[in-house]
Amino acid sequence: SKPEVKAHIELESKVIVDLEKQIYALESLKLNTVANSSAMPLQQANLDLQADIHANMASELVTIQNLAINLQATGSEQNIDANIEGLIEANLASQQHSITNLVISADIEDKNLPGGKSKLDVTSNLIANLADETLQVNDLAIKFADLTMNGRILAEKILSDDLAYNGNIQVKPFNLRKLAEDLKIELPEMADNSTLELVQLSSEISGSKQSLNTKDLQLTLDQSQLTGQFGINNFEKPAYTFNLMLDQIDADRYLPPAKEEVEDKTAKEVSTPASSAAGGSSELPLETLRDINAKGSLKIGKLKVSGINSENIVITIDAKDGLIKLSPLAAELYQGKYQGNVNLDARGDNLKLAVDENLQGVQAGPLLKDLTGNDRIAGTANANVKLNGSGKDIDAIKQSLNGNGAFSFTDGALKGINIAEAIRQAKAVLSGQKAAETNEPVQTDFSSLKGTFTANEGIVNNQDLELMSPLLRVTGAGDIDLPREVIDYAVRVSIVGSAEGQGGKTLEDLKGITIPVKITGSFDNPRPKVDLASVLKEQATGEIKAKAEEKLKEKLGDELGGLLGKKLGGDSKSSTSDETTEEPATDEQTSDEADSADEPSEEDLLKEKLKSLF
């Protein structure tokens, strides 16, 4: 059955009728209607209307003057008290109608509004041409709570499904955070609670029932200015187009605050590899990525995000049906440049990722300091990397990474590991001495550091690491396990510098010797281990041999010592003679050999000398 509606209507007016001139009027019209229904959102409505209505049917003109409408509606959760005023003129012949000085004001009571109530004010001048199917909304002004908007709109084909419109809007400065609080709208948690306190907007607009386009967009958000063009097509399944420019923004202020880390070294050391191997990250939003339909570019003058500062950023996106291309990407950061291409494929069960990125002349220390809070490596960095992987979550993608790359750093330092100091400590322990205390920073300075790498299933392998410094020459090879965040690396360190180099004074006696160093541990806690024992053993063996020969020389005499040295060291002449191809002897050679046969050999002389000792 249809819901029941009860209504009471009262009508009072002075009626004027001139049939000859076809003039009709309702003066001092008063209409009161009271309606009740449990089926209506507002169960009770009381409408009062006052107006003077004049109609000239000869000229087909109708005028409604002194229009005043009051509507009072009450419901279980809402109450509305609204007033409407204006002048209505209708030309029935041309089908052009207008409402001049339209004023709508409403007091709304709702538990979801600030203080349980708010006020809405609307003013405008309307012109409608039903023959042309056009509607002009001029001098539009809307005020709700602390939000004020002005504008102008021209709509075409208003009686068909091909509605189109254009115009402009201006939103005066307002405090979005306060407005949301007043309307009891919960905003996402942000690192800076002073954000969203200034918002201002102006734009040219156009569109249809299923589209909205902005041109000459100017949006102020706190200290940031966004300009350009933005469009949405198909509101049910939106497709976005844009060409935007943002002067500057500190995005970290709008992101959730960083969680405080509980410092528990034991738990950290145990959980870092294990948690990475277990892969506890949440699944990637593949369905959301598939729904992205966007094409455009965003240029940013200055950007701070995740602590990283960059300038002149270019982000270009082309995304549709699960294929997302971010190309080209570009930025200037830390005195260098970044260029890259990123491709995402979310059409399958796993997200496929492919990156091709390049860094040139970037100061690695300040970059890492801002990004992680720890500048593990400093210097001017150049790098290129091509990687691809797939998975349902970040950990799975790490475990599937494949590709290659190259890197180089100049005039920098490896921080958290002082190779020279590690060698000094090992040397002191093996010598039974205590290493001298030092105030040197825990870092290894270098003039250049370079290498290439390959990635296979998340394991990054490098075979040609080369580090050069005034004191050290380092070569290395090994693996970095990205999923487990652990290091397994072997380097060979050669002391080449003078006493003026980093720690050079106490290492001068190791100059020219190559020392193996094993580096293991986690990303947060790399542990170098110097195998100096084998090196010192080899060095000591050589020194003992040299001293023994010297003692023999002192006791046996220079002549015998020299002979013994020749025998211990080998006779190069005899070796050469053995390898020389024999030729027929001449008569002169035969005579010389006969004479030399009568002279004692070096071996005979050595034997005679040894006999004389005993």
Regions found by a protein language model. Give the residues of each.
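Surface-exposed acidic, glycine/proline-enriched linker/cap segments
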Residues: 267-285, 430-442
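Extended, low-complexity, charged intrinsically disordered regions
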Residues: 53, 88-90, 276-281
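Intrinsic low-complexity, intrinsically disordered segments
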Residues: 255, 274-301, 305, 595-604
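Protein-protein interaction and targeting regions used for scaffolding, dimerization, and localization
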Residues: 532-614
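Small-residue helix/turn framework positions
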Residues: 2-12, 21-50, 54, 59-81, ...
